[in-house]
């Protein structure tokens, strides 16, 4: 605004600003009474017109047609006026324009020169309107009369019908006259009427419920129950279990939920059931059940089926004496012979797994005399044992490592890692061994392993022995692998009677060893002794013997035959001594 050169416009703007921002109205009364700039402007214009008429010059003579350019005209004399005008009044070219006085305030014809009301006037008007409304409102105080309740409303006397059942009273003896057998409480009567509550045998699996856990990973599974009737079988049972729960524990929890939701459905033990893969429409697939020892988080199935385990297919083995196991059967006669042997074996197998007797009876599964009958409980145990053996046989070829101690010929122990698979066994010294020098690892094919047994059992420890074929030309681990010459003395097997060294662990090369080298004309055997806990020893023994029984090599049969002959000779010697 300060850069604007028209002083008359600046003064007009200041005047209009005072008028528009004054809330009291006093400035408007004083400054709007007489608009002095406009009055001075009209007076200045009228005086300027009269003066210009008086100073109009006379006509020049005709002789001088061309004006003299060198002639100077004097300036007009100063006109004296009787008023003081705003400076810069004659510099404004648009005095008639209404917007020249102020660019902020625009006066429109339809609005007029009315000024907006101040905030004070608006507040006063609102207060006036509120007072008028309050004058039309009438306030009335309402007091509710509350009657206090009477005591009889709270303590009403109930009428109990005096109905006593007519029970024939028994005559009591003189000793029972003071007894209170005739008085029974309502709790006693309710307990007598209610059925006997039996303890749920699956209650221990309730701790795997994932709905009551906070901050732990859970897994939701829809389980179809195959033991339910047809209408209820089509709808899955929704369960939420912990992610760390194993399949065996999930089966127990599903049985627990089933016993609560369907109490009339009889349930068997956990060994009878398995979780099978299924589709969303309850179509159970032809796959084996999930492994009971695996966690449920390992499998990503959202729908499973709980059903009884399928019966194991009977395995028939036909041995051909004098023939190699890998012989290719290209002859039609050999094929016919094998087919006839398989048919005869299938005919001799009954439904309960026992072999049929030629006379018509079943061995181990039919009816017998005296104590030979098999109860249903024994059949269930036998079936569960077969299931466990089946699982062990399926998992036996898988590689697994065990950490245990090997005993060398100097009675020293060193930590080793024993790896067992369906192809070989590996013995590797533990890398963090501090005192003993590092020894070379041993890798032996499973075809050279003959037998595995637990020699000694202590409180929490066990002595495990693995027999394998000896190779005198190469010995990778001399501390645990001993070799005896052919003419060496062969010790006998300790059976626990008549031997002072029974139950004592011996070094492989010590003379008191329980079982030395077996030998034939061409085969010699050696063994490794391991010291570990009882549970690990049982796992290794079961796993390795399952592998050896499935392969049934010629080396193992030779070992067992030699061992049986030595035991027979030992018993004959004992009888001769007696």
From Swiss-Prot:
Taking the record's annotation, the residue ranges forming a coiled coil are none
Bias class Gly residues marks the residues at 356-367
Mind telling me which InterPro entries this protein's record contains? CRIM_dom, PH-like_dom_sf, Sin1/Avo1, Sin1_N, Sin1_PH_dom
The UniProt record lists the CRIM domain at 184-309
UniProt keywords (A-Z) are: Apoptosis
Q: One GO BP annotation here?
A: TORC2 signaling
Q: Does the keyword Ribosomal protein apply?
A: no
Q: Under the cellular component aspect of Gene Ontology, which terms does the record hold?
A: cytoplasm; plasma membrane; TORC2 complex
For this protein, the record's PANTHER family field holds: TARGET OF RAPAMYCIN COMPLEX 2 SUBUNIT MAPKAP1
Q: What is this protein called?
A: Stress-activated map kinase-interacting protein 1
Phylogenetic lineage: Eukaryota, Metazoa, Ecdysozoa, Arthropoda, Hexapoda
